[in-house]
């Protein structure tokens, strides 16, 4: 009887710990579930474009993580901090402003462009919910996200 209670309690602990980490059968075994999406932290550094491509190759419809709420970001921060500690990781946000149509204050279209090569990709801190502009070619850690497969 004691052994049965131990095993039952052990299974309950495993079940509760898995539900707390977001494990769900709709995600691949090493991905975590949250609100209809699957997430995976990658402990390797890549440029923004290489990380985005890598996420696309990992799972159909995969991409660098995006956030739709502070709760979602908190979930990702809880996953990343133990791995990356006080570092930054790529997020899917990218500033595509260079592709917009700009006009000078005198009404003339901007045909000549002399933009500096300042960063136009974004990273997230692992310590709080802040994003920073970062050089896209700088290798960083990253998190992939995908919709739950039906």
Curated annotation (Swiss-Prot):
InterPro entries: C-type_lectin-like, C-type_lectin-like/link_sf, C-type_lectin/snaclec_domain, C-type_lectin_CS, CTDL_fold. PROSITE patterns: C_TYPE_LECTIN_1, C_TYPE_LECTIN_2. Residues 1-23 form the signal peptide. GO terms for cellular component: extracellular region. Coiled coil: none annotated. Pfam families: Lectin_C. Disulfide bonds join 27-38, 55-144, 121-136. It is found in: Secreted. Interferes with one step of hemostasis (modulation of platelet aggregation, or coagulation cascade, for example). Heterodimer; disulfide-linked. Belongs to the snaclec family. This is Snaclec 7.
């Amino acid at each position: 009887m004691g052994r049965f209670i131990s095993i039952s309690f052990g299974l309950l602990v495993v079940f509760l710990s898995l539900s707390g980490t977001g494990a769900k059968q709709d995600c691949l075994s090493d991905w975590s579930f949250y609100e209809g999406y699957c997430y995976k932290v990658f402990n390797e550094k890549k440029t923004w474009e290489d990380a985005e491509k890598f996420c696309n190759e990992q799972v159909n419809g995969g991409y660098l993580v995006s956030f739709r709420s502070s709760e979602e970001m908190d979930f990702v921060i809880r996953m990343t901090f133990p791995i990356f500690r006080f570092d930054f990781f790529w997020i899917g946000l990218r500033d595509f402003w260079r592709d917009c149509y700009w006009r000078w204050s005198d009404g003339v279209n901007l045909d000549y462009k002399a933009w500096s090569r300042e960063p136009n990709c974004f990273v997230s801190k692992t310590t709080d919910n802040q994003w920073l502009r970062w050089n896209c070619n700088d290798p960083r850690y990253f998190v992939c996200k995908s919709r739950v497969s039906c």
